[in-house]
Amino acid sequence: MANTVKVTQTRSSIGRLPKHKATLRGLGLRRIGHTVELEDTPCVRGMINQVYYMVKVEG
C-alpha cells in the first residue's frame, strides 16, 4: 500500500480565495475538524502547500 497522509482542516474557508476553497474541496475537506486520509503523491502535496495555513498534516 502507498504511503498516506492525514489532513485536517483547522481554519474556516469563509472569505478565502475561490481557488483555495476549490483546493479544500479537492482534498475532500468540508468543515473545520474534518480529517481525510490521502495518498502521499506530489499532486496532493502541492494542494496541501497551497492551503497550508488552513490545514494540519500528519504522517
From Swiss-Prot:
CDD domains: Ribosomal_L30 (cd01658)
PROSITE patterns: RIBOSOMAL_L30 (PS00634)
SUPFAM superfamilies assigned to the protein according to its UniProt record, in alphabetical order: Ribosomal protein L30p/L7e (SSF55129)
Pfam families: Ribosomal_L30 (PF00327)
Alphabetical list of InterPro entries matching this protein: Ribo_uL30_ferredoxin-like_sf, Ribosomal_uL30_bac-type, Ribosomal_uL30_CS, Ribosomal_uL30_ferredoxin-like
Biological processes, Gene Ontology terms: translation
Protein's name according to its UniProt entry: Large ribosomal subunit protein uL30
Source organism of this protein record: Aeromonas hydrophila subsp. hydrophila (strain ATCC 7966 / DSM 30187 / BCRC 13018 / CCUG 14551 / JCM 1027 / KCTC 2358 / NCIMB 9240 / NCTC 8049)
